[in-house]
């Protein structure tokens, strides 16, 4: 939630897949199991398969695909050329108030894409956060710890990101209004 807007949750403009329905993570695991293993060059997967497998899972609570956190409407829809632009909309990212903050976000996303291209993320199971999702990640401490883990993993993979580059993001998302002595 470090880069999200102020409005989050199942009725927001970009809900996470696991914020609305309890069974969505299980269904997503089933969908992911239909893709060939990473690095399996022997199995060709048509680009439109991603759209067909994930379209009804990456939705908001009303079934709207355009309001999901990850919107694949323009990735590779078999229904027409306007849906075959190769675009993945990451709708949960709020436009930061400064261009340099935007550049830091873009650098982070490029590093993550490059890292996952080399070594796809393939956990045995997805995490079922339940209500702990908002209980934890609305607090700056847990967001900071989670972000530090991401930056550490990227650095270990050879991407020289620095956590300090994102200090303005933390100040913006979690402003300090006072201190108790």
Annotate each PLM feature.
Residues 1-181:
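C-terminal accessory/tail domains of diverse enzymes
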């Amino acid at each position: 939630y470090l880069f999200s807007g102020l409005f989050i949750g199942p009725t927001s403009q970009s809900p996470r897949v696991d914020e609305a329905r309890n069974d969505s993570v299980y269904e997503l695991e089933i969908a992911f199991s239909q893709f060939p293993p990473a690095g399996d060059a022997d199995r060709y997967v048509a680009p439109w398969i991603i759209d067909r497998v994930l379209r009804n899972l990456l939705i908001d609570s009303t079934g709207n695909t355009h309001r999901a956190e990850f919107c694949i409407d323009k990735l590779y829809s078999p229904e027409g050329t306007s849906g075959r632009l190769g675009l993945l909309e990451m709708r949960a990212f709020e436009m930061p108030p400064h261009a340099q903050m935007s550049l830091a976000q873009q650098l982070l996303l490029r590093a993550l894409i490059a890292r996952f291209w080399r070594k796809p993320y393939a956990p045995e199971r997805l995490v079922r956060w339940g209500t702990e999702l908002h209980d934890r990640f609305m607090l700056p401490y847990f967001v900071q710890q989670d972000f530090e883990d991401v930056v550490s993993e990227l650095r270990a993979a050879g991407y020289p990101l620095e956590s300090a580059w994102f200090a303005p993001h933390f100040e913006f998302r979690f402003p300090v209004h006072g201190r108790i002595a």
